[in-house]
Amino acid sequence: SDLVGLLTSEDSATRQHHMSVRSILIHVTEVPMLGTLVRLYRGIQELRNQVIEDWTVNSRDWTMPGFRAIAVHRLGTWLANRRSGVVKSGLLAVYRVLYRYVRNHYGIEIPLTVTIGRRLWLVHQHGIVFHWKAEIGDDCLIRHGATIGAGYGGQKTLHKGPKLGQRVEVGPGAVIFAGVKIGDDAVIGPNAVVMSDVPAGARVFAEAPRVIHLPTAHQAARKK
């Protein structure tokens, strides 16, 4: 009976200890500062995951201008969604410097207000411009010289950003006008000018160039 009493008292003490620890943890999680740190950690993890995905599709090369442009944009949008404070203000200042560097040095202009899905692939650099309200879906591919959201048709249209669905490919030199919607899996060919909505899975190509035969110098001399 003494042994049973000893074991019972130990179990009771253990239970009380666990209950006290659980109570402490509950109170700790209610501390605002800890909640902020947890949210910050989760936000950093999500940012990290997005950047790793972008790095993977952009040739797994951190020196690629396209990857750097996207990474800077990810940082900016992540900071914009954080609560205000001295740290946020300082990091936003760093973001603005990086944004201008990417725009001026690589020729890739992605305003902070652009919405970009996961795993965007920017092939090559220079001349890639996004409308400030553009929306880009997951797994899209955009090549050099593309303009996503050229303005025309007055103020109403100018303030409507184009929307690209998922897995859309945009060829070099293509122009997609403001307010245009591109469906999933569509392909916009090189130098195509898109002024109206494109259904999912469609292919848009510019007209084939005409071959013009000019008279040779010998033929021109004979005509004289």
Each language-model region and where it sits:
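Left-handed beta-helix
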Residues: 106, 111-112, 117-118, 123-132, ...
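Conserved catalytic-core motifs of eukaryotic protein kinase domains, centered on the activation segment
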Residues: 152-154, 215-216
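Terminal amphipathic alpha-helical/low-complexity segments used for targeting or macromolecular assembly
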Residues: 2-11, 18-106, 217-224
